[in-house]
């Protein structure tokens, strides 16, 4: 099959059903209020809101608190489309955020933006990776 034929197949309605659409938004959040970063219930609620905002379907959510110097909270939402993972280090006023979705209907950028806006870091980095099969 020529390159042109492959592109025609991928862009056809049938071809779109045959390929995987992967959108991965991830980043680092700096200088966040430490109290928010240690509030497991707040962070879990925040991730649940992000799931809804991004039009994802929740399968399960788990949250854990960790003590010690490098302690914080981890919240993982397993969604039908993939996942949202938020990890915090309260003593460092730092968090990492990972939003990965498969399919055309979900919007990982809106989930990422919602969490960033709620945590209100003084600065953050956001990265995007296209993880589609074609």
UniProtKB/Swiss-Prot annotation:
Q: How does activity depend on pH?
A: Optimum pH is 6.
| The keyword Lyase belongs to this UniProt entry's keyword annotation | yes
Required co-factors = pyruvate
Kindly tell me the pathway this chain contributes to.
Amine and polyamine biosynthesis; agmatine biosynthesis; agmatine from L-arginine: step 1/1
Q: List, alphabetically, the Pfam families matched.
A: AdoMet_dc
Query: What EC designation does it have?
Result: 4.1.1.19
Q: Which reaction does it catalyse?
A: L-arginine + H(+) = agmatine + CO2
List modified residues, type Pyruvic acid (Ser).
82
- Catalytic-site annotation from UniProt: 82, 87, 102
**Single GO cellular component term:** cytosol
Q: Temperature note from the UniProt entry?
A: Optimum temperature is 80 degrees Celsius. Highly thermostable. Retains 80% activity after incubation at 90 degrees Celsius for 10 minutes.
Mind telling me which residues the site (Cleavage (non-hydrolytic)) is annotated on? 81-82
Activity control summary: Highly competitively inhibited by L-argininamide and L-arginine methyl ester. Also inhibited by alpha-difluoromethylarginine. Is not stimulated by potassium chloride as observed for other decarboxylases.
Modification after translation is described as: Is synthesized initially as an inactive proenzyme. Formation of the active enzyme involves a self-maturation process in which the active site pyruvoyl group is generated from an internal serine residue via an autocatalytic post-translational modification. Two non-identical subunits are generated from the proenzyme in this reaction, and the pyruvate is formed at the N-terminus of the alpha chain, which is derived from the carboxyl end of the proenzyme.
What are the record keywords, sorted?
Autocatalytic cleavage, Decarboxylase, Lyase, Polyamine biosynthesis, Pyruvate, Schiff base, Zymogen
Q: Which InterPro entries match?
A: AdoMetDC_fam_prok, ArgDC, S-AdoMet_deCO2ase_core, S-AdoMet_deCOase_pro-enz
Q: What does the note accompanying the cofactor annotation read? A: Binds 1 pyruvoyl group covalently per subunit.
Q: Which domain of life is it from?
A: Archaea
Any one of the GO BP annotations: arginine catabolic process
Tell me one GO molecular function of this protein.
arginine decarboxylase activity
Extra notes? A chimeric protein containing the beta subunit of SSO0536 and the alpha subunit of SSO0585 (SpeH) has ArgDC activity and no AdoMetDC activity, implicating residues responsible for substrate specificity in the beta subunit. But additional factors in the alpha subunit are required for efficient cleavage and turnover.
Subunit comment = Heterooctamer of four alpha and four beta chains arranged as a tetramer of alpha/beta heterodimers.
Q: What does this protein do?
A: Specifically catalyzes the decarboxylation of L-arginine to agmatine. Is also able to decarboxylate L-canavanine, although less efficiently. Has no S-adenosylmethionine decarboxylase (AdoMetDC) activity.
Please state which protein family the record places this protein in.
Answer: Belongs to the prokaryotic AdoMetDC family. Type 1 subfamily.
Q: What is this protein called?
A: Arginine decarboxylase proenzyme
Identify the species of origin.
Saccharolobus solfataricus (strain ATCC 35092 / DSM 1617 / JCM 11322 / P2)
């Amino acid at each position: 099959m020529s390159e042109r034929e492959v592109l025609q197949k991928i862009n056809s309605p049938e071809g779109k059903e045959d390929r995987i659409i992967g959108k991965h938004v991830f980043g680092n959040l700096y200088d966040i209020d430490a109290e928010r970063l240690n509030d497991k219930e707040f962070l879990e609620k925040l991730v649940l809101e992000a799931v809804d905002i991004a039009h994802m379907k929740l399968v399960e959510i788990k949250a854990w608190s960790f003590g010690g110097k490098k302690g914080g909270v981890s919240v993982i939402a397993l969604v039908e489309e993939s996942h949202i993972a938020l990890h915090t280090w309260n003593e460092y006023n730092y968090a990492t955020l990972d939003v990965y979705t498969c399919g055309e209907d979900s919007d990982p950028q809106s989930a990422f933006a919602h969490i960033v806006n709620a945590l209100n870091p003084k600065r953050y980095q956001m990265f995007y990776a296209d993880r589609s099969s074609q």
